[in-house]
Amino acid sequence: MKHNNVIPNGHFKKHWQNYVKTWFNQPARKTRRRIARQKKAVKIFPRPTSGPLRPVVHGQTLKYNMKVRTGKGFTLEELKAAGIPKKLAPTIGIAVDHRRKNRSLEGLQTNVQRLKTYKTKLVIFPRRARKVKAGDSTPEELANATQVQGDYLPIVREKPTMELVKLTSEMKSFKAFDKIRLERTNKRHAGARAKRAAEAEKEEKK
């Protein structure tokens, strides 16, 4: 070794050049995927290209639970509230997830409204062209129907308006992370503290 150069420390195998991963097929793969998408769109016509309608859900864990995204499927409760039978839903392009549970009224109402909006825009083709059943769309609607490309009923993330206020010394001294930790600790010990307080009250009465 001489001069101020990097000390070589490459941990290579003896014939490492024979095992280098190449990506020469990348442009062709891109073309192949595009053609496959076009073929699928033709095959599933007149259904939307992006698949069935999915619900709006909140992400899991403390990091993501403030963000909304599309979920796997609508709950049976949501379908019932929107007046859609659970057996019919998958046949008209609505994803169903029997395992998911509604944990808030707001979430339930949002998805019920989403389903109702979808129903108003839905065009149902008859299974057999000559046998039109109840619930199928009119011939005029069928003639004007087009295949939806890309996302439909996209999630609109509203940005809250910011209100500018003057900084006070109290605001500057406030430690948000410490406050969150304190409140989380209080929540964790709430049951034990309540029990201890009840026992102390019982002792005083004696």
UniProtKB/Swiss-Prot annotation:
GO cellular component assignments: cytosol; cytosolic large ribosomal subunit; cytosolic ribosome; nucleolus; plant-type cell wall; plant-type vacuole; plasmodesma
Origin superkingdom: Eukaryota
Location (main, coarse): cytoplasm
One GO biological process term: translation
Biased composition, class Basic residues, residue ranges: 186-195
Biased composition (Basic and acidic residues): 196-206
GO molecular function: mRNA binding; structural constituent of ribosome
InterPro entries: Ribosomal_eL13 (IPR001380), Ribosomal_eL13_CS (IPR018256)
Gene3D superfamilies found in the cross-reference section: 1.20.5.110
Pfam families, per the entry: Ribosomal_L13e
Endpoints of the signal sequence: none
Residue numbers spanned by region Disordered: 185-206
Cellular compartments annotated: Cytoplasm
Keywords noted in UniProt: Cytoplasm, Ribonucleoprotein, Ribosomal protein
Family per record: Belongs to the eukaryotic ribosomal protein eL13 family.
Protein's name according to its UniProt entry: Large ribosomal subunit protein eL13z
Organism: Arabidopsis thaliana (Mouse-ear cress)
Species classification: Eukaryota, Viridiplantae, Streptophyta, Embryophyta, Tracheophyta
